[in-house]
Amino acid sequence: MTATIRIAYISLADPNDRRSWSGGIWSMARALERHAGEVTCLGPVNHQRLELRSGKLLASLAHTTTGKRYAPHHSLFWARRHARFFEQQLAGKEFDLIFAPVASSIIPFLKTDIPVISLSDATFAAMEGYYEDYSDLLASSRTAGHELERRTLEKSARAVYPSPWAAESAVRDYGMPRERTAVYPLGANLEEPPSREDALTKQRGAECRLLLLGRDWERKGGGIALDALKELELLGISATLTVVGCRPPAGVEHPRMAVVPFINKNEPAGRLRFRELLLSSDFLVLPTRAECYGYVFAEASAFGLFSFATDTGGVPGVVANGDNGALLPLSAGGREWAEAIAERFSDDALYLQGRLHARNAFEERLNWDAWGIRTAELMRQVLAENLSKGTL
């Protein structure tokens, strides 16, 4: 019988909030409870509001005086304070292992002999110059960001990533030994995924229903998705586009584009609305300009939605080209996106194959049980290694 692992789950965010890290913080905790052992959640921190307020103030001051960006989530001061907070939380308790998702502002200065497994969807080096918020940074923010990342990896018995893109950066940019990295795709953040039958029931109709999910119209490529909608009409395909999670800029409208600015998945009504939208759509379309992973692709796969996505960042870690989706180059415009969509929508066999492959991808690799099983095995490996070294 496998011994239960006592896991300290360390996170700045609230693990009970389904919105934290797009739902990933909550989902990982539940998966580890099912497959690894006893999970004790030690977050969130009690000074997060103060940190956010001070970060916004410093960011505004930096931009006003230097034109540069301050990275509030990469502060040596707050990293030390976070470490002290979690040291107090760990004191007097018995744990076998620390699991720390998105914790490069906790782990660097944490004083503990408990082995750490960290998880992130990117490194600081991968983010710098890739996301707008990580461009034109203050020299002090760059220095702090790289130091925190390096310290986190040094303290991690294993660093888990959802994509080869992120893992390669840890190895290339910070010298992390490859054998101490692991690549496990993250699951779909769905409390009640649809059954296979429900996901595969929808047939191709006369109208191509496109769905875009994202909070940032510009970064998610909303303009390209709208152009694709217009180009589909020129190709003779009746189509609609439903945008969920953000608002287009003022004046950006189309009679066949609907906008749902926000869905609260913490509430049953919100989860039902989200479910209905995915069940009634034909394709997920996300011409993202920058992306570390993309839970939405896993969620789309659960509903049998073939995803059209940009070949950038960590997206290939969740969208396998020709399997559960199609990857288009960053340079592709609305016409190229429309042609790719039209090719699959116009062919019954291709359409149904895409739905089947998407659902299979969810069942085989893009669900939290698959992630939890692999991560639990990794935890047992780490504990066995430490036991053989006499460090436990």
List the predicted regions and their residue ranges.
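Conserved donor-binding/catalytic core segment of Leloir-type glycosyltransferases
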Residues: 160, 197-220, 226-230, 241
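Aromatic "clamp/platform" in nucleotide-sugar-dependent glycosyltransferases that forms part
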Residues: 289
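Carbohydrate-associated surface elements
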Residues: 165, 187
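Nucleotide-activated donor-binding/catalytic signature segment of Leloir-type glycosyltransferases, i.e.
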Residues: 245-283
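A short, well-ordered alpha-helix in the C-terminal region of glycosyltransferases
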Residues: 350-365, 374
